[in-house]
């Protein structure tokens, strides 16, 4: 089983307000926000952005989120380094983290098993 493509992007920022305005200017709409400098923006049926503010001394990062339909059936090829296997998240999915050949981490997410 392969992924279904890019589902979203986890994006760290040093300024939630400016980043949200930047994404809004590109056509994204705020879906929800929190009281601690984070939120989700979406563009019609396209990938979402989960944006979270990080401290000034932390380097902002971005992580792509790939979608699979069934976590139990997904078996990445041996070339894919699994950093952490599928685990339930507090936002209602199952999430695996993998590392690409350049050391970047990617998320692979699936719906919760029924």
Residue locations for each model-derived region?
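Residue-level structural signal for beta-strand termini and adjacent loop
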Residues: 36, 53-55, 88, 111
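Short acidic/glycine-enriched loop/turn segments that link adjacent beta-strands
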Residues: 35-38, 58-60, 90-94
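Short, charged/polar, Gly/Pro-enriched secondary-structure boundary elements
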Residues: 46-50, 103-105
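Vicinal oxygen chelate
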Residues: 15-17, 63-105, 110-113
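A short linear hydrophobic-aromatic micro-motif
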Residues: 29, 50-51, 83-85
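Core segments of cupin and vicinal oxygen chelate
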Residues: 3-4, 10-48
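Short, charged/polar surface micro-motifs in flexible loops or helix N-caps
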Residues: 45-48, 56-58, 70-74
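Eukaryotic phosphotyrosine signaling hubs
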Residues: 6-8, 59-64
